[in-house]
């Protein structure tokens, strides 16, 4: 006889499915391979409807541009977010298999309130879900950071978060910035204070190893754009980040919406081993 614990879980595991590097994989196939569902399935989209290349995926619209970095296109090279088709088919597929949808959406911070309300209303039918808005916004590579200041990005998050809470109360907003710094403060803490307060969930992305020069160079000793860090370093960074954010903005959940070890850097064996070490830590 086996005993089951019906209380709250000690942790939860989500699965990213599709990004700038990969197509969406249907949930029947994933469940057949892994044998069990996850709490949520993450999907990634972009929304820049006023750009001249829209609604094409930007890498296809600008296939003749001289690009040397994944994020050098006019807007982010995720699949385009639109009112019908791909995003909604995927969310229905996720929900059919008893999982929550975790949408990441990079979008134009100059969109009107009417346009933002339209996006929020489209999320109503999909039950409990999260939306991560303009993620990794402490960086410089995504379009929202190229076109807007950090303060503008933070204020936009808070404003869009308010609209989502009004129009789609089933949706929790996720603010994804950086980690606590050497001085103890969060990265861009002052500029992002309003966003930390407005969010339902905080996130910080974590790649123990990452080939960020993909697909334009090779991750090899002496060449290529890549990095590798220790499990212990990231575990300490998460702890310090949560403690600082909670002390300044009240306790909220902190997740890592993107976590992996890039097999381009480590190879598949160490990729799996390092993820296990992080989970055990």
Enumerate the predicted regions with their spans.
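Active-site groove signature of glycoside hydrolases
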Residues: 120-150, 174-181
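Structural recognition of alpha->loop->beta junctions
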Residues: 125-129, 139, 189-209, 278-281
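Glycoside hydrolase catalytic-domain groove-lining segments
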Residues: 61, 66-76, 82, 207, ...
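Distinct, well-ordered alpha-helical segments
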Residues: 115-119, 181-197
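N-terminal carbohydrate-binding/catalytic regions of secreted carbohydrate-active enzymes
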Residues: 12-125, 274-281
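Aromatic-lined carbohydrate-recognition surfaces of secreted/lumenal glycan-active proteins
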Residues: 162-188, 249-265
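Hydrophobic faces of well-ordered beta-strands that scaffold small-molecule active sites
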Residues: 6-15, 39-43, 101-105, 129-133, ...
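Active-site beta-loop-alpha junctions enriched in small/polar residues
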Residues: 14-18, 43-48, 106-110, 134-138, ...
């Amino acid at each position: 006889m086996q005993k089951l614990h019906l209380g709250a879980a000690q942790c939860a595991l989500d699965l990213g499915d599709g990004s700038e590097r990969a197509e969406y994989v249907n949930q029947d196939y994933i469940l057949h391979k892994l044998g069990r569902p996850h709490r949520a399935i993450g999907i990634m989209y972009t929304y820049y409807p006023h750009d001249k290349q829209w609604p094409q995926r930007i890498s296809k619209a600008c296939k003749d541009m001289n690009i040397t970095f994944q994020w050098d296109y006019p807007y982010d090279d995720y699949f385009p977010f639109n009112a019908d088709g791909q995003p909604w088919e995927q969310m229905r597929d996720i929900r059919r298999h008893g999982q929550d949808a975790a949408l990441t959406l990079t979008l134009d911070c100059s969109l009107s309130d009417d346009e933002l309300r339209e996006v929020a209303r489209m999320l109503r039918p999909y039950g409990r879900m999260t939306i991560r808005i303009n993620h990794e916004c402490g960086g410089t590579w995504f379009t929202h950071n190229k076109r807007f200041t950090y303060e503008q990005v933070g204020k936009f998050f808070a404003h869009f978060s308010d609209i989502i809470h009004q129009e789609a109360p089933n949706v929790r907003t996720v603010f994804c910035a950086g980690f606590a710094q050497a001085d103890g403060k969060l990265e861009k803490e002052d500029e992002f204070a309003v966003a930390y307060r407005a969010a339902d969930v905080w996130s910080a992305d974590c790649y123990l190893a990452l080939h960020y020069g993909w697909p334009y160079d090779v991750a090899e000793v002496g060449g290529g754009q890549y990095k590798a860090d220790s499990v212990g370093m990231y575990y300490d960074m998460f702890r310090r980040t949560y403690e600082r954010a909670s002390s300044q903005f009240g306790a909220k959940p902190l997740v890592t919406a993107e976590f992996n070890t890039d097999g381009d850097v480590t190879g598949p064996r160490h990729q799996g081993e390092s993820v296990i070490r992080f989970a055990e830590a």
